[in-house]
């Protein structure tokens, strides 16, 4: 009891807003051992989806996840590595293209909505579908996520010729780490940046407090109990964090992803704008203006305010309720099962809670400290690789990581 009280009161005051749920007090990442089969090496690996099995085990229970490794990163969708390589080698961009890049669950859908509204006029009638994905019939203005749309192992929903025929401005989405980003391929980050400059593509990269991103991905991706996954209960958050901080989740390690894209955004006249979820949350009008400026779009204060209104969490959740999409039912069921506080009617895990600092409801103070320590040490390694001091990101609530 005394230990519990100590743990609760020793919550890291700098990174811990209110809302801690005492039922999570015992979460401890150290009790989980993580395994990768086959062991992940640093060389670029190309294996089909499901070829890598990752798991967290405490000796009594084992929680598995599986991914394909394409270009050395765990692919979020079933991907055919050969198709992916072909896509990488042949895709052509235009200088009117805009890409929203991110590590998953950091506010991609939100920034897509902002970009689409900025480009096409903040007109409610435009109504970019709640999850903004391109669809020839339903949402021809939507974002194109080239990697799964073209390189899917099961079926491609778009050919490269169809992509080439889309009218400007095309909006793309990608979760690729910088060195695997389409159109960049170079032997160094500088060479990749030079390639990116040549394409004329403008990129908005959005980052988020990694703990909020980890929780958000947990509610979308951590496997459900049942025969298929051979687990009796949902994976506990500490097991998830053990995998997450190792990069054994969709799109690999958060830190490498963010640090590298951040470094590229710091180059002189970089085509990449780095924004955080938290800055958008704190001052949406300022964030939307920053994005408009990066895209070279002159917009009045009235236009900006209209974009802010139509990209608010409530406005987007209302859209999602009107237009549920395939997969939403599964996600809603999952989020409800796992107490993810999603509005079952809105049925979209892409619009689950929309808060900053809400990770605190799901972490114990100990888990929070362990997560911070893992973050800091992997950030130090990533920064050393990039040849600079570790960047510090202000994730709001006095949380600088
Ligand atoms: P939560 O799961 O914490 O609610 P992505 O689009 O990259 O998958 O990110 C999804 C996360 O962004 C979800 O976080 C979602 O609720 C949040 N989000 C989406 N639209 C938002 C908006 N307009 N305002 C704030 N958060 C938003």
Predicted regions, residues:
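Cleavable N-terminal signal peptides of Sec/SRP-targeted secreted and luminal proteins
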Residues: 1-13
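PAPS-dependent sulfotransferase catalytic domain
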Residues: 14-275, 343-400
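PAPS/PAP-binding and catalytic site of the sulfotransferase fold
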Residues: 107-121, 274-299, 307, 315, ...
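Short, conserved secondary-structure transition motifs
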Residues: 144-151, 310-319
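Conserved C-terminal subdomain of P-loop nucleotide-binding cores
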Residues: 211, 221, 237, 288-299, ...
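Amphipathic alpha-helical surface "interface" segments used
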Residues: 308-314, 329-335, 388-401
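Short amphipathic alpha-helical segments at helix boundaries and their inter-helical linkers
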Residues: 312-326, 381-387
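Mobile gating loops/cap/lid regions near enzyme active sites that modulate substrate access
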Residues: 319-343
């Amino acid at each position: 009891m005394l230990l519990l009280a100590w743990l609760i009161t020793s919550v890291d005051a700098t990174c811990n807003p209110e809302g801690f749920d005492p039922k999570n007090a015992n979460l401890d990442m150290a009790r989980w051992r993580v395994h990768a089969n086959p062991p992940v090496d640093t060389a670029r690996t190309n294996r089909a989806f499901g070829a890598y099995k990752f798991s967290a085990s405490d000796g009594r229970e084992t929680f598995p996840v599986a991914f394909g490794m394409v270009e050395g990163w765990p692919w979020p969708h079933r991907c055919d590595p050969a198709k992916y390589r072909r896509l990488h080698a042949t895709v052509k961009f235009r200088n009117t293209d805009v890409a929203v890049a991110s590590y998953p669950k950091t506010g991609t859908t939100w920034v897509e909505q902002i970009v689409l509204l900025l480009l096409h006029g903040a007109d409610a009638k435009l109504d970019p579908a709640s999850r903004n994905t391109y669809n020839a019939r339903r949402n021809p203005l939507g974002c194109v996520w080239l990697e799964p749309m073209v390189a899917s192992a099961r079926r491609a929903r778009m050919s490269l010729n169809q992509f080439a025929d889309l009218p400007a401005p095309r909006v793309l989405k990608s979760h690729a780490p910088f060195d695997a980003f389409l159109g960049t391929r170079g032997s160094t980050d500088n060479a990749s940046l030079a390639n990116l400059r040549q394409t004329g593509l403008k990129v908005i990269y959005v980052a988020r407090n990694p703990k909020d991103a980890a929780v958000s991905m947990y509610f979308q991706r951590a496997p459900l109990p049942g025969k298929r996954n051979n687990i009796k209960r949902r994976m506990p958050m500490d097991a998830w964090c053990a995998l997450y901080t190792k990069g054994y989740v969709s799109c690999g390690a958060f830190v490498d992803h963010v640090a590298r894209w951040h470094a590229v955004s710091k180059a002189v006249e970089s085509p990449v704008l780095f924004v955080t979820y938290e800055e958008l949350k704190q001052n949406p009008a300022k964030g939307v203006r920053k994005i408009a400026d990066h895209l070279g779009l002159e917009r009045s204060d009235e236009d900006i305010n209209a974009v802010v209104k139509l990209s608010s969490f409530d406005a987007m959740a209302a859209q999602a309720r009107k237009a549920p999409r395939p997969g939403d039912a599964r996600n809603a069921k999952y989020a409800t099962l796992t107490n993810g506080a999603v509005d079952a009617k809105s049925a979209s895990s892409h619009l689950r809670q929309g808060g900053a600092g809400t990770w605190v409801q799901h972490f114990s103070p100990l888990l929070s400290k362990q997560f911070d320590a893992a973050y800091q040490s992997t950030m130090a390694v990533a920064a050393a690789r990039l040849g600079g001091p570790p960047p510090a990101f202000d994730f709001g609530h006095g949380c600088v990581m």
